[in-house]
């Protein structure tokens, strides 16, 4: 069994919207087979955590409550009875703020290590679709996997089974 899987959200779990933000669950579309992949990954990882930049909150396009509702619906769609994702960390800050939580900085990962002190960094992975995801993961000492439309979360899963 692997330790912790950190997942970015937009572009890894769900389809990114071109030039705008996913602000509610009606706009949220799972990338092909990402939901199935998460269900399988849940069986081979000790925990799954999401780390996602959500500056739409900082821009006033959505609220933290909107985001929480979206994430609750995402969780219930993945499994109606249990949370397959153990915790979701998000940074609401604008990029210009240069805060510590916004990737490529490692604040969300540091918070996860505080919440789950037994995380074994060397046995953990971060899967992301952007350079900022990969930089954050590498700077924190995680194994990193970059996905895109041709190499998805589900494709990666097949390489580790």
Predicted regions and their residues:
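Active-site neighborhood of HAD-like aspartate-dependent phosphohydrolases
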Residues: 1-49
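Active-site flanking residues adjacent to catalytic metal/cofactor-binding acidic residues
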Residues: 7-9, 52, 127-129
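Histidine-centered beta-alpha loop that forms part of the nucleotide-sugar donor binding/catalytic region
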Residues: 16, 53, 149
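Substrate-recognition element of Asp-dependent hydrolases with the DxDx(T/V) motif
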Residues: 34, 38-71, 87-94, 137
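Asp-based, Mg2+/Mn2+-dependent phosphohydrolase catalytic module
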Residues: 65, 69-84, 96-126, 130-161
């Amino acid at each position: 069994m692997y330790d912790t899987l950190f997942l970015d959200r937009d572009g890894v779990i769900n389809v990114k919207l071109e030039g705008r933000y996913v602000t509610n669950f009606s706009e949220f579309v799972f990338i092909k087979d990402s939901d199935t992949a998460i269900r399988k990954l849940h069986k081979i990882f000790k925990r799954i955590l999401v780390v996602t930049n959500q500056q739409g909150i900082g821009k006033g396009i959505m609220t933290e409550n909107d985001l929480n509702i979206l994430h609750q619906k995402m969780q219930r769609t993945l499994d109606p009875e249990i949370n397959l994702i153990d915790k979701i960390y998000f940074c609401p800050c604008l990029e210009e703020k240069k805060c510590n939580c916004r990737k490529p900085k490692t604040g969300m990962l540091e918070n996860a290590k505080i919440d789950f002190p037994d995380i074994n960094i060397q046995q953990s992975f971060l899967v992301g679709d952007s350079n900022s995801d990969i930089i954050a993961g590498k700077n924190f000492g995680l194994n990193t996997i970059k996905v895109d439309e041709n190499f998805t979360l589900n494709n990666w899963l097949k390489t580790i089974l």
